[in-house]
Amino acid sequence: MILGIDASTYLDELAHGAKYFDGNVPIDPLDAFHANGVDCMRIRVWNDPRSPDGEPYLAGDCDMDHYIRLGKLAKAKGYRLLLDFHYSDFWADPGKQMIPKAWQGMDVDALCDAVYTYTKDCLTAARAADVAPDFVQVGNEITNGILWPVGKLTLEDGTRGNYDAFCRLLAAGCRACREVLPKAEIILHLEKSNDQAVYREFFTQMETHGMDYDIIGASYYPYWHGTPEELFANLDACRSFGMRIMVMELGYGFTDRPYRLDGGEKRLVIDADRSYVPGFTEKYPMTPAGQADFVRDFLTAARSHGVDGVFYWEPLWIPGEGICWASPAGQKYIGEEGKSTENEWANQCLFDYEGRKLPAFDAYTL
C-alpha cells in the first residue's frame, strides 16, 4: 500500500519560519515521514491564485511554479509525486468549483480546449523540470462536477445530471495527461465516501462515457463522511469497476481547543462545538492518543480491504504568523468573504501547535 501526504503548504510554513520537533530535537519532517514509509507527495495546483490586482490568495500560493519547487524538494528526498489539478484559481471542493478568471465566459467547447491546453502545458513543464508526477488527479473532490456551472452535476431542482458536458471536460484533462505522461496513473477523486449510490452512479457514468482513468480516489473525514465501516463498504463495492482504489485525503483532530496567536484564540473548522457536524459519531476522542488510535485503526482496515494508497491531508500545516487558509482576496474569489484569515485546520495536523511530533505521526507508517 502506498502511504502519502499532501503537504502543499510546506514551503509556506518554511518561509514563515516554522520548526518541527521530535520532543525538543529539531527534525526535518519530510525525512521523518520517509523513514516511516511515506513515499508519495500530493501537491495541489491552482491556475492563478491571485486577484486581478496581484494580491495572493495564500494557503500556499499553489500555482505550477510552486509545484515545481516543492516537487524538486520532495523528489530529492525520495518521494514520488502526485499532481492534484483543481482547475480553479483557488479551493475546489464539493461546495465550489469556480471557473478560473481567465476562462470565465467560455462555453463547453472552449473550456474543453482550455482544460486540454492547460493540463498539457503544466505536465510538459513538470517533465522538463524533472518533476513529472507519477500520479495525476484530474479535478479535486469532483462529486458535484467541475468548472461550474458548465460542468456542474447537481442541478437547480436538486437532481443530478449534465454528465455529457462534465465528461467532455474531464476527458480533455485525461487526454492531455496520456499524451504527455503515458505512464502516469490518472485519478478521479470524489468525497461523500459513505454514499454508495453516488459512487455507483458516478463511476457507471464514467464507464458509459468511456473515461480513461486508473484510480478511484475518495476523501475520508469522519466529521462528514460517516463511519470507517461505511467508507470501506463503499470502496469494496467500487471494486466492480476494475480500478485501483485510494484514499486521497484523510484527517482527524488531536484536540478541539483553539490555538492562540496575537493574544487571541483562533477559530477552527472542527472545535468543541459539534453543531457544525451534526452527523459526526465521535468514536475516537479528539486527543493525541485518540488521533493516534484513529490513524492506526484506519491503516489496519485499509490494508485488510486492499486499499492501494492512503494520503494524510496537510499534516504539517501548523499555526503561525502569516499562515492562513485564505486572504481577503481569496475569500472574495470563492464567495466566502468575511471569514477568519487564520489557519482553521491546525488541529488536524500530525504535529501540535508548537510543532512537536504527535503520537499519530508514528502510527502513520507501513
Annotate the PLM regions.
Residues 1-32:
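Boundary/entry segment of secreted carbohydrate-active catalytic domains
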Residues 32-185, 191:
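Substrate-binding cleft and catalytic face of glycoside hydrolase catalytic domains
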Residues 13-24, 48-65, 143-146, 191-200, ...:
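Acidic-and-aromatic substrate-binding clefts and catalytic sites of carbohydrate-active enzymes
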Residues 24-25, 62-66, 110-118, 162-169, ...:
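Soluble or luminal CAZymes and related metallo-dependent hydrolases
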Residues 16-18, 93-96, 148-151, 199-201, ...:
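Short aromatic-enriched loop/helix-cap "lid" or pocket-rim segments at secondary-structure transitions
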Residues 154-156, 233, 237, 255-272, ...:
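Aromatic-rich peripheral "rim/lid" segments of glycoside hydrolase catalytic domains that contact
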Residues 27-34, 164, 175, 179-185, ...:
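Glycoside hydrolase catalytic-domain groove-lining segments
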Residues 3-7, 39-43, 81-85, 134-138, ...:
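Hydrophobic faces of well-ordered beta-strands that scaffold small-molecule active sites
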